[in-house]
Design a protein with these regions (language model features):
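Short, Lys/Arg-rich flexible segments
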Residues: 1-164
Length: 164
């Protein structure tokens, strides 16, 4: 028993698959930019909201009470400086960097010899990672579906003319 498989227009199909990389360049760049903004938004949200359970301090200039975050929690917002210094920078078309320009950012993120970490950027990345991966998957799926529709249309077109 023999089974023959004949792929018509293989060169055209392979050409379309070869375009997949080119077709995905702009959507991937959109995901990179949007992913950076998503990470920044998560970091800001973690600092500005959520119950903090650290020590309450009396602060001066201006006079106020401030509840600090406990070790392991995102830092508690006090003056808004930390949040205002979180930036998204486009390094090149495929790389976005989320960074905090506050002088004390690294001390909060990683801790010091006298203070345990109050991370805010890495947890924001971890929380955003699934959404970013899903956005990449959706764009790949859309591009592949577009090629699949083209291949089906090509097959239908070939059947139409082979019947004549």
């Amino acid at each position: 028993m023999d089974i023959k498989i004949n792929v018509k227009n293989l060169k055209k199909v392979m050409s379309q698959l070869g375009r997949l990389n080119q077709d995905l360049e702009v959507p991937f760049q959109e995901v990179v930019k949007g992913g950076g903004q998503l990470i920044r938004a998560e970091a800001v949200k973690s600092i500005q909201s959520g119950g903090k359970s650290g020590i309450v301090y009396e602060k001066y200039n201006p006079r106020r009470s401030h509840r600090a975050s406990a070790p392991g929690q995102a830092p508690a917002s006090d003056t808004g400086n930390l949040v205002s210094k979180i930036r998204v920078k486009q390094k090149d078309k495929n790389t976005t960097q989320v960074e905090s320009g506050a002088d004390y950012s690294a001390y909060l993120e990683y801790g010091t010899s006298k203070m345990l970490p109050r991370p805010f950027l890495f947890p924001a990345f971890e929380k955003s990672r699934g959404k970013i991966a899903k956005a990449v998957f959706e764009r790949v799926k859309t591009a592949i579906n577009r090629i699949a529709k083209w291949v089906i249309m090509l097959q239908h077109y070939n059947k139409q003319f082979s019947m004549l």
